[in-house]
């Protein structure tokens, strides 16, 4: 199941409530403010703080 980009208009980072960006390559939603990546599983964003992955300098 593909991620629906229209969701970006209504979802927000659960930590800072900021805008998320979709990374098609890694299938993650990225919060640049908190430097966190949230996984997308079977087209569904997992917006749980304990499932977020810290971004590295290379991302």
UniProtKB/Swiss-Prot annotation:
Q: Known InterPro entries for this protein?
A: Trm112-like
- GO CC terms of this entry: cytosol
Any Pfam family matching the protein = Trm112p
Q: Which residues form a coiled coil?
A: none
What residue ranges are annotated as transmembrane? none
Q: Which family does it belong to?
A: Belongs to the UPF0434 family.
Protein known as: UPF0434 protein Sbal_1685
């Amino acid at each position: 199941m593909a991620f629906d980009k229209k969701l970006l208009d209504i979802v927000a980072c659960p930590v800072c409530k900021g805008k998320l960006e979709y990374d098609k390559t890694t299938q993650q939603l990225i919060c640049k403010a908190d430097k966190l990546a949230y996984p997308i599983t079977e087209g569904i964003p997992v917006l749980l703080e304990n499932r977020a992955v810290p971004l590295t300098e290379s991302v």
